[in-house]
Structures are given as C-alpha cells and as structure tokens.
Curated annotation (Swiss-Prot):
EC number assigned by the record: 4.2.1.59
Protein family (similarity comment): Belongs to the thioester dehydratase family. FabZ subfamily.
CDD domains reported in the protein's UniProt record: FabZ
The protein's name in its UniProt record: 3-hydroxyacyl-[acyl-carrier-protein] dehydratase FabZ
Tree of life domain: Bacteria
Function: Involved in unsaturated fatty acids biosynthesis. Catalyzes the dehydration of short chain beta-hydroxyacyl-ACPs and long chain saturated and unsaturated beta-hydroxyacyl-ACPs.
Gene responsible for this protein: fabZ
Pfam families noted in UniProt: FabA
Predominant place of localization: cytoplasm
SUPFAM superfamilies reported for this sequence: Thioesterase/thiol ester dehydrase-isomerase
Amino acid sequence: MLDTQQIKEIIPHRYPFLLVDRITEVEEGKRAKGYKNVTANEEFFNGHFPQYPVMPGVLIVEALAQVGAVAMLIKEENRGRLAFFAGIDNCRFKKQVKPGDQLHLEVEIIRARGTIGRGKGVATVDGEVVCEVELTFALGE
C-alpha cells in the first residue's frame, strides 16, 4: 500500500491536481488499484456545480490515469520519467460521483512497448461502475 507521500515520490502531481489518496495494490508495469475520497471541499465543486456538486468526468479519467502512471513509473527503469496522455478511447460515464463517495480506481496495463502503452481503467463507487475507459500513454523525460 502506498500513501499520498509515497505516491508523490512516483508521480509529479500535486494539490489540487493529485487525484489519488492511496494505492492499495500495485504490480509493476502490469496493474494498480487505488482510491480517492471525494470530499465537499474539492476545488472543482466550487463551479461544477454549486447547487448540485458532481465530480467532472474528465477528472475521474485523470484519476485513473494517475493510478496507471503509478503502475508504470514505479518500475525502477521508469523512475523520474513522466507519463503523458496520448489518447482516450471508449470512455463511458455510467453514474455521477458526489461528495462523500469513495472512488475506487483500477487500471490494467494491456500493452506496453518502448515508451508507448495502453491501459484499461475502471472506476467504481460502492461496487458500481461509474466510468470505464481505455487510456493510451507515452513515457517521457
């Protein structure tokens, strides 16, 4: 298990854009699981939407990408590198994520060759799928 401080040693994201609180499982270069506790104090709720706070779907995708980045960047040969979005495919949002939810994030790396890879991400709340996506990434310096 990795806490926030340990996650920050692997990926460069910081408040308010670090969207993973814990990594609960990781297999280097293969998969990772983690979660984000979604609180009413999140900056994005100030404008999305003040009377009906909903976590923006693109931030759910970003949270999944950060979990996938941990799976890739925890590998010794990738330490100090960055993981960049190269594509998003087959993205579906199935339910809203609201303050008080614990967003569970799981990414499986389905292909990685050189500096390009692809992962399948699933986000759930209370066991129900809220988002599914295929992520393409590029590793850079």
